[in-house]
C-alpha cells in the first residue's frame, strides 16, 4: 500500500519521496491546495477562540460573518444559509429539505430523486443511494428507494455520435426530462 506522508500545494508526497498530483483535491475538500500557512494560522486562531459549537438555536460571530458573505454573492432572493458538516451531510440535508418543502406545500408524493450515472454524492446511506457508481453501493444494497439515474452529462464521455457539445447538451437535458415524465412530475423532488 502506498503511504502518503505529506502534501504541498497540489501535490501528495509518499513515503518514498515521490510526488503525485492530488487529482481529487483531498476527496474534494482541499481545492485550494495543501499546506496553506494562512489557513492553518486562521484555523489555529479560531480553535483557540471557539473550536466548535453547534448552530442549533445559537449563532456565533464567524458563522454570521460567513453567512453574510455567502448571501452577498448569492443570486437575488437567496437570503438564508444552512450550514452542514460536509459533503454527504449537505446532500442528505438538501434531500430532506426538498422532501419537507413539498410536504409543507401540499405535495407529499414528491419524494423521488434523479441523479446522473457515475456521479458521486457521498457515503452516508441516503447520499450513497443517489451516487451513481455501482461498485460503491453493491455491498450496502438495498439502499433508500426512490432514486433513479440518467446518463452522465460529461461531453468528453459522449462518444462520436454527437457532432457538437451543444447537441450533446440537448440530448442530456432530454434524458432528464424523460426521467421526470416517466417517474411522474408530481413525484420528483430533486435532481442531484
Map each language-model feature to its residues:
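A residue-level signal for beta-strand positions that form part of recognition/binding surfaces
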Residues: 9, 20, 146-147
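Residue-level recognition of short loop/turn positions
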Residues: 15-16
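Short helix-terminating capping/connector loops at secondary-structure junctions
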Residues: 77, 105-110, 143, 185-187
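PLP-dependent aminotransferase-class I/II
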Residues: 117-192
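Short, small/polar residue-rich loop motifs at catalytic or cofactor-binding pockets
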Residues: 4-8
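Glycine-rich loop-to-alpha-helix module at the N-terminal edge of alpha/beta enzyme cores
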Residues: 19-107, 114
Amino acid at each position: 500500500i502506498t503511504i502518503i506522508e505529506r502534501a504541498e500545494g497540489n501535490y501528495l508526497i509518499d513515503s518514498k519521496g515521490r510526488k503525485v498530483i492530488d487529482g481529487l483535491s483531498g476527496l474534494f475538500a482541499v481545492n485550494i491546495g495543501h499546506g496553506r500557512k494562512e489557513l492553518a494560522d486562521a484555523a489555529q486562531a479560531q480553535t483557540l477562540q471557539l473550536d466548535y459549537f453547534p448552530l442549533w438555536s445559537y449563532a456565533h460571530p464567524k458563522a454570521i460573518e460567513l453567512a453574510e458573505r455567502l448571501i452577498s454573492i448569492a443570486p437575488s432572493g437567496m437570503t438564508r444559509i444552512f450550514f452542514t458538516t460536509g459533503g454527504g451531510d449537505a446532500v442528505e440535508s438538501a434531500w430532506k429539505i426538498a422532501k419537507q418543502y413539498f410536504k409543507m406545500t401540499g405535495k407529499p408524493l414528491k419524494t423521488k430523486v434523479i441523479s446522473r450515472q457515475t456521479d458521486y454524492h457521498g457515503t452516508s446511506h441516503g447520499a450513497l443511494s443517489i451516487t451513481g457508481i455501482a461498485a460503491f453501493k453493491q455491498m450496502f444494497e438495498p439502499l433508500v428507494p426512490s432514486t433513479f439515474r440518467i446518463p452522465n452529462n460529461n461531453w468528453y464521455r459522449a462518444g462520436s455520435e454527437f457532432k457538437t457539445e451543444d447537441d450533446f447538451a440537448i440530448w442530456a437535458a432530454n434524458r432528464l426530462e424523460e426521467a421526470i415524465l416517466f417517474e411522474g412530475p408530481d413525484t420528483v423532488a430533486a435532481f442531484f
